[in-house]
Amino acid sequence: LMKDILSEIIANKRFEVDLQKQAISIEQLQEGISEVPTSRSMKQALASSASGIIAEFKRRSPSKGWIKEEACPEEIVPSYAAAGASALSILTDEKFFGGSLKDIRTARPLVEIPILRKDFIIDEYQLYQAKIVGADAVLLIAAALEPEKCNELAEKAHELGLEVLLEIHSSEELIYIDKKIDMVGINNRNLGTFFTDVENSFRLAGQLPQDAVLVSESGISDPEIVNRLRAAGFRGFLIGETFMKTQQPGETLQNFLQAIQ
């Protein structure tokens, strides 16, 4: 039996955030917020975009190990934007995904499209961090949070001018959706086992509010799946590994988009 990766990641994250708070207090972070430029709307970008592709920058994952250890945001991020990505997702978890907040800081001045901080957010401290490095949106994972905590973090994110992508992977988590949620992501990967099944998006789509901006995450390796998902009401398609495992992720995205048209 594969052990629950999510609980291991969350335990490590609590430890990490505690250490970060010792180094830089939340008050110090709050002071740094004033000079941060205003956010771009990821929700608008997805609702109005032709592609809806949220191209992901990640070096590794718990299920695959290293995908591209030496990957540089300076090269890959602008190539994603040039190829036609609607938004970017940048993994900032170091231990399990090989990323850092520096990756967003580096990427921000290089592109005009919105950036999602993808991490395991459990504390408002991480929302301040996201804002300071230039993220426009944050991921909140239902499986990692109690509904009340999720609600509280979504409210705080909005106070800071960050949009919220709520990630769910089962109908039990539909209770997490309320008006503070800007986008709803359906994760096709079970976070306990990291097994992927795109049909999960189709199963849940019909149970979601009509006005929700829907995003399908993980396991999208084929342009034809994007067409099917779009027909089912999805507006955003989060794709990482399919691009990152190739020599030129931006070029792979470009070809992928041509195949969708």
Region spans (language model):
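An N-cap/entry alpha-helix motif that binds or orients negatively charged groups
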Residues: 3-68
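C-terminal helical cap(s) of enzyme catalytic domains, especially alpha/beta-barrels
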Residues: 204-207, 230, 245-261
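Glycine-rich phosphate-binding active-site loops on the catalytic face of alpha/beta enzymes
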Residues: 129-149, 186-195, 234-253
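Catalytic cores of alpha/beta
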Residues: 122-133, 169-180, 216, 220-239
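N-terminal active-site wall of soluble small-molecule enzyme domains
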Residues: 57, 64-165, 171-176, 201-204
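Active-site beta-loop-alpha junctions enriched in small/polar residues
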Residues: 12, 58-60, 93, 120, ...
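Conserved, mostly hydrophobic/aromatic
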Residues: 9, 55, 80, 88, ...
